[in-house]
């Protein structure tokens, strides 16, 4: 149960993390997220006026902090495509938690623009960064991002980010059977002794455009089996309650890896994350079918108290645990799930 005064949902799960999508656009067309046959030249992305402004985002974050949020992650789409993203980072970096501590302010990126923006992001107050990287082999990486983008450019961005101090830097690899699962060991080998934490994520049924099927999932247990065949691994305890990754370290001290088993070992029971979409809708689950329109309140003249009360009401009524129900075979039929590119991963 959360500490006294923290906002909790129907299962006692505290509101602690807020993921904010700052754009629905991306310069990649990854096959599991924004497949090119759907997100083509005719796809209607949001207009700038539909996006939350930086001032609106800052106001929202202040209100979420009042309810106990301590960690903010900026996502997309690709967040580095949002013009002047450094200014938003600077605005949010000035804020403190309810306990007077600096916010844990992070960002997830595909790394394509990271080399040119890393220093400015660090100077603006970004704490650290997570990079999505689904292969170390260039041909495989180009096929996964489907825009013929070279892996060397992302690796350069990672090096620059690490050099300017956006650390500990994490890398997320979504593992899809038959597409990039042959990259598990090579990616691990590349980042051993680098100080970078590599995490392997089970391919998820987020949205409906990626044509997900269970047969394409490589279970985390299989990922660990393959890694253990190449390197001696030792389990690590969680850093904090509700951590999504199961942590492991190399026995020779070469670093840390993790697996995120969102399909085979769902962690809904201690999920503390809310998501704010690009146009200001509050989603309580990555697999949600609908959100609560907070932008309408902001632009309709609602007071901070009215918006804060809306956040409280929505979170306290939260019952979401889709992944646990999916795993047990009892997930009810749902409507059209929101796409990952709209609310971030």
Curated annotation (Swiss-Prot):
Residues annotated to bind GTP: 19, 73, 108, 170, 273-275
Q: Which residues bind S-adenosyl-L-methionine?
A: 32, 77, 132, 204
Top-level enzyme category? lyase
Domain (Radical SAM core) spans: 10-234
EC annotation from Swiss-Prot or TrEMBL: 4.1.99.22
The record, for Pfam families, names: Fer4_12, Mob_synth_C, Radical_SAM
Q: Which InterPro entries match?
A: Aldolase_TIM, Elp3/MiaA/NifB-like_rSAM, MoaA, MoaA_NifB_PqqE_Fe-S-bd_CS, MoaA_twitch, MoCo_biosynth_MoaA/MoaC, rSAM
- Binding-site residues for [4Fe-4S] cluster 2, renumbered to this chain: 268, 271, 285
ATP-binding in keyword set: no
Gene Ontology terms: biological process: Mo-molybdopterin cofactor biosynthetic process
> How and how many cofactors are bound, per the record note?
Binds 2 [4Fe-4S] clusters. Binds 1 [4Fe-4S] cluster coordinated with 3 cysteines and an exchangeable S-adenosyl-L-methionine and 1 [4Fe-4S] cluster coordinated with 3 cysteines and the GTP-derived substrate.
Q: Which UniProt keywords apply?
A: 4Fe-4S, GTP-binding, Iron, Iron-sulfur, Lyase, Metal-binding, Molybdenum cofactor biosynthesis, Nucleotide-binding, S-adenosyl-L-methionine
Q: Where does [4Fe-4S] cluster 1 bind?
A: 26, 30, 33
**GO terms for molecular function, please?**
4 iron, 4 sulfur cluster binding; cyclic pyranopterin monophosphate synthase activity; GTP 3',8'-cyclase activity; GTP binding; metal ion binding; S-adenosyl-L-methionine binding
Q: Which cofactor is essential here?
A: [4Fe-4S] cluster
Q: Which transformation does this protein catalyse, written as a reaction?
A: GTP + AH2 + S-adenosyl-L-methionine = (8S)-3',8-cyclo-7,8-dihydroguanosine 5'-triphosphate + 5'-deoxyadenosine + L-methionine + A + H(+)
Q: Which HAMAP family match?
A: MoaA_B (MF_01225_B)
**Subunit info?**
Monomer and homodimer.
- Protein task: Catalyzes the cyclization of GTP to (8S)-3',8-cyclo-7,8-dihydroguanosine 5'-triphosphate.
Task: Report the family membership.
Answer: Belongs to the radical SAM superfamily. MoaA family.
* PANTHER family listed in its UniProt record: MOLYBDENUM COFACTOR BIOSYNTHESIS PROTEIN 1 (PTHR22960:SF0), MOLYBDOPTERIN COFACTOR SYNTHESIS PROTEIN A (PTHR22960)
This chain's protein is named GTP 3',8-cyclase
Q: What is the protein's species of origin?
A: Ralstonia nicotianae (strain ATCC BAA-1114 / GMI1000) (Ralstonia solanacearum)
Gene name of this polypeptide: moaA
């Amino acid at each position: 149960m959360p500490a006294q005064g923290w906002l909790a949902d129907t299962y006692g799960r505290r509101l602690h993390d807020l993921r904010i999508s700052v754009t629905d656009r991306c310069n990649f067309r990854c096959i599991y997220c924004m497949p090119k046959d759907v997100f083509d030249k005719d796809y209607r992305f949001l207009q700038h006026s539909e996006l939350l402004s930086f001032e609106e985002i800052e106001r929202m974050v202040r209100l979420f902090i009042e309810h106990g949020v301590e960690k903010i992650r900026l996502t997309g789409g690709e967040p580095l495509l949002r013009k002047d993203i450094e200014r938003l980072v600077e605005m949010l970096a000035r804020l403190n938690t309810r306990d007077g501590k600096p916010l844990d302010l992070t960002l997830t990126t595909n790394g394509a623009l990271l080399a040119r923006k890393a220093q400015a992001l660090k100077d603006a107050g970004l704490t650290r960064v997570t990079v999505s990287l689904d292969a170390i082999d260039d041909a495989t990486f180009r096929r996964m991002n489907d825009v013929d983008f070279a892996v060397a450019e992302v690796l350069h961005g990672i090096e620059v980010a690490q050099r300017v101090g956006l650390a500990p830097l994490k890398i997320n690899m979504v593992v899809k059977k038959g597409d990039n699962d042959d990259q598990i060991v090579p990616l691990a080998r590349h980042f051993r002794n680098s100080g970078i934490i590599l995490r392997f994520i089970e391919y998820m049924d987020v949205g409906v455009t990626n044509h997900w099927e269970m047969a394409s999932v490589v279970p985390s247990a299989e990922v660990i089996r393959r890694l253990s065949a190449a390197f001696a691994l030792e389990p690590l305890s969680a850093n904090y309650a509700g951590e999504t990754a199961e942590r492991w370290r190399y026995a020779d001290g070469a670093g840390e890896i993790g697996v995120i088993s969102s399909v085979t070992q769902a962690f809904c029971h201690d999920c503390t994350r809310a998501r704010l979409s690009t146009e200001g809708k509050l989603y309580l689950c990555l697999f949600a079918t609908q959100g609560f329109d907070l932008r309408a309140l902001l632009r309709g003249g609602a007071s901070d108290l009215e918006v804060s009360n809306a956040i409280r009401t929505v979170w306290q009524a939260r019952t979401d645990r889709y992944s646990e129900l999916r795993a047990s075979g009892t997930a009810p039929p749902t409507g059209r799930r929101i796409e990952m590119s709209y609310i971030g991963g």
